[in-house]
């Protein structure tokens, strides 16, 4: 009789499972998130300059500190004028110069305010709105739908023919995060509205603009009218509703009001034959407001937003007032972050790839890239096997799904090609001017893509970003360098820990290619129906079951998670975790997983996954997330494990415990 292989006890390096952060008094089957993270939650205070604190924000803080070191060094170097290193140093130093910013007052903004004050008619209004258009939204890759400008622009491959780029126009114009903040009748929202109107008046007063309260009332009334024509967050995320290519000349008849010829000419889009209207009803409604509302009100509105959006590079009184509303009231954050942090983040936003090259050279070892690439390969193989084993999917649909999986491009660490900043002018001492020029540079860089071949290897995140992304139109994934550290990834940890951590993130991003949105794009990034009707019906039914599960989560008595709004992320969590669990099992090669910290391999895998989601969020910020974000609160994402059969024996979860689901009720999407 052969001996049964016994698990070996191995130490973990760096992070592993944070046993001290657990709360073993909680039953895993009643509250898995609390069991994994309860000790950490009790012991952790959210930093005063943060609205939330958790694994992602802790790593982001570390990336910010690392970047500060690099930028401080750059400032001390005598880099040649015009070099990227000099631009990085001068941009950063200009943002640190609080005394210089205070001394300049509103002077750097006067040309913009003068242009607004000089507007004489709606044609000139349209021209100015076009001049102010920026590439400040990304509805698909970053699910970023918000801009305080009347419209936002996104340049990306054509959803119907992804070998060419198209400009996409999105709704905007609101100072509050979402139309619900204007239209929800609850006392809580009414209080936020009153404070926002007071904030508008306060900014106008600081700028010595007379009759601030009356103007604030008119500005707020205009934004409320905008909110009434806005499309909801849930509908905005529906790509089938968004693919509306309009001929440029048709905007005048489809969305009458705004002088579109003047708008597009000023925006540099007058040579584009087609512009995609992402939210056509909203664009139509906003265009009508351009002529139905008094020009004087538009001038007041534009002046307020011109000042408010630049508060970070204006005298401290403006910054403090903006933080008082957006930081304290909307997010519940009690304290403004230090100037160096804000300077790092601003520099990162303007010159992200230049900073990224410094970051990768210092902090990203080549061996980490190789390890992650191997893990990606294993998880893709596991997902491929899961497709083979789907008993409900027709052979022809499986062929299409496997084709999409096999052609997936995976970028790890950093891009193959960096952005060239030679066309960006950075002037030491001009914090506001640098910010404006950086935004315009980014806008023109996107416009320059129109008419060019699509770069399928283009990155949409910088290496120092703690995140990962699926790019449906490129059928690609990006895993930036900054996420490849504990607790996501630790070269010295067990395979179970790494697969539960970074592996589940990899699986999540792969699975976005097959969530309710990604599944509508084929292997070439084209919006196409590659499903049989029966397969699609089964897939949608599973999605509805998962949405219903998340609809039962109540973070507050008066506010529930929106299962439909968060469905893409929830499908990616579930499918990704399932495929990653398979990949981890395959990586064992038939051997027994080693014990670590007294936990079996199965337990390590699920504990590592749960540990990734540890987060504390201030109530106002959590409410804002639930209303505006496509991601469910972290604690419910950790409870995704309740849908995996393997989780039940790993923690001896029994019927009657809170998270227990009967096998027939466990959602299986892929």
Locations of the language-model features?
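Short, Gly/Pro- and small/polar-rich lid/capping loops
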Residues: 8-20
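Hydrophobic/aromatic-rich, well-ordered segments within soluble, folded domains that form packed cores
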Residues: 22-42, 182-204, 393, 567, ...
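Short, solvent-exposed loop/turn and secondary-structure capping segments
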Residues: 43-47, 154-156, 178-180, 230-233, ...
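Short secondary-structure subsegments characteristic of cysteine-rich extracellular domains
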Residues: 49-71, 212-229, 498-504, 602-605
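Noncatalytic, helix-rich "gating/capping" subdomain that lines the substrate-entry/channel surface
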Residues: 74-378
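Intrinsically disordered, low-complexity linker/terminal regions across diverse proteins
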Residues: 225, 254-257, 269, 276-280, ...
